[in-house]
Regions:
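N-terminal domain-start interaction segment
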Residues: 1-31, 66-80, 119-124
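A short, sequence-level motif marking secondary-structure junctions
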Residues: 16-18, 38, 87-92
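Long, charged/polar, surface-exposed segments that mediate recognition or autoinhibition
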Residues: 27-55
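Surface-exposed patches in mature extracellular/periplasmic domains of secreted proteins
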Residues: 57-65
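Short, well-ordered, aromatic-rich surface patches in folded extracellular/luminal domains
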Residues: 70-124
């Protein structure tokens, strides 16, 4: 799931093997977040929800970055790349058929943020 902002594009990458990362096009991000149980659970939810919406995606070989205010979804399979694009506000306000996928992706980002805020070595 890629979201276009004026200053950068944020990419949340979730894989079936449990790998979860966040990449920021202007630099930085979070790699290996799937090691955190809550992040992994949110990622599994995203994959499960996305699977239900596969018919809403189109086959495509191009992977352009989303424009500001747009969200681009990708599904990579062994045989194809599927894509869909929508307005972030429409997704956020449940006005788009892929809103559930968007909100599940936001759940992954929330869990990544919470996991990165936990103190290291202390009581958690």
């Amino acid at each position: 799931m890629e979201t276009g902002y004026e200053e950068a594009v944020a990419t949340v990458a979730v894989f079936a093997d449990g790998s979860v990362s966040l990449y920021i096009s202007s630099g930085g991000g979070i790699i290996g977040a799937g090691e955190h149980p809550m992040v992994r659970e949110a990622a599994e939810r995203l994959l499960t929800i996305t699977e239900k919406y596969v018919p809403e995606f189109e086959s495509g070989s191009q992977t352009p970055l989303p424009q500001t205010g747009r969200v681009r979804f990708y599904i990579r399979t062994f045989t194809a790349t599927l894509t869909a694009d929508a307005d972030e506000q429409d997704l956020g306000q449940h006005r788009h058929k892929l809103s559930a996928v968007f909100h599940a992706g936001q759940g992954v980002i929330t869990e990544m943020r919470l996991a990165s805020e936990k103190p290291k070595g202390g009581i958690q």
